[in-house]
């Protein structure tokens, strides 16, 4: 296995983030749009070695292959199901995917030119440890980057859901990512990266359009059970789920053609590992 990986075999099949085919219509397609812009803004030199931590279905890895001109991309995720999905979806020989814990990455130190993570940090029990691991596996002078959704305001497809759910069920407010994940704010992300010893830390917004053909295209992914909002929707009795659907239909914006024009904002953070590269390193 490349780069001295010690593959872990933890199976996360029962995790709410374990089914790649259900994740794609809910978040995956929008994540790909953000990932492409995220990689472009990193402005990393070609022929580098990249690590994609919490690779999921491979959105960031594919963006790196498409635009980053890497020599190699290694993706790691705690979910064996996602790892298998990424392997099937991405056949590029420069990419490989392994199971691994973001808090104890299965890679040696200082092996990557770039280490990144997309839409993962806020779900981890110890984000600071994960960022420290990203820094550890990055070579001196290399780039570390991540992005998370702006759940509190700018991730509109989820924001409308929780506002509607909370109006019908006060319990839903406790599950709202905008409340649960204060990490997903610029000041918290900056402090997280600075605390890991990274230098030149910057945080910026990435906004992408998320247009749905009609309300059914917007609503159906919430029935896939992938992530907090869909998990909540599928936990409801049928009558209460129908009431939530009706309220959402009433509050989301509709264009004249029946489509639903929304946008999704992610906060992207990046920094460099201090120190200079060694010759030939």
Show which residues each predicted segment covers.
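Class I SAM-dependent methyltransferase Rossmann-like catalytic core
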Residues: 17-29
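Conserved alpha-helix/loop element of class I SAM-dependent methyltransferases that forms part
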Residues: 29-48, 63
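A short SAM/SAH-binding and catalytic strip from SAM-dependent methyltransferases
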Residues: 113-127, 150
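A short acidic, Gly/Pro-enriched loop at the edge of an enzyme's catalytic core
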Residues: 103-114
């Amino acid at each position: 296995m490349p780069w001295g990986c010690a593959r872990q075999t933890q199976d996360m099949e029962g995790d709410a983030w374990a089914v790649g085919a259900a994740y794609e219509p809910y978040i995956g397609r929008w994540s790909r749009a953000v990932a492409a812009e995220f990689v472009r803004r990193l402005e990393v030199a070609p022929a580098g070695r990249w690590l994609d931590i919490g690779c999921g279905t491979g959105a960031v890895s594919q963006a790196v292959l498409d635009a980053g001109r890497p020599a190699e991309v290694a993706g790691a995720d705690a979910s064996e199901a996602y790892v298998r999905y990424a392997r099937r979806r991405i056949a590029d020989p420069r990419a490989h995917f392994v199971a691994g814990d973001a808090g104890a990455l299965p890679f040696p130190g200082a092996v990557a030119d770039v280490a990144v993570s997309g839409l993962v940090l806020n779900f981890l029990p110890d984000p600071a440890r994960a960022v420290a691991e990203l820094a550890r596996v990055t070579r001196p002078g290399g780039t570390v980057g991540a992005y998370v959704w702006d759940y509190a305001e700018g991730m509109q497809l989820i924001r409308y859901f929780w506002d509607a759910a909370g109006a019908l069920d006060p319990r839903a407010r406790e599950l709202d990512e905008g409340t649960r994940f204060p990490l997903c704010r610029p000041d918290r992300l900056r402090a997280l990266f600075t605390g890991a010893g990274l230098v030149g830390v910057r945080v910026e917004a990435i906004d992408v359009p998320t247009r749905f053909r009609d309300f059914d295209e917007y609503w159906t992914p919430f029935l896939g059970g992938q992530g907090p909002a869909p998990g909540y929707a599928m936990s409801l009795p049928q009558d209460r789920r129908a009431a939530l659907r009706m309220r959402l239909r009433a509050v989301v914006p509709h264009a004249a053609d029946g489509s639903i024009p929304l946008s999704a904002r992610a906060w992207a953070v990046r920094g460099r590992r201090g120190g200079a590269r060694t010759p030939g390193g």
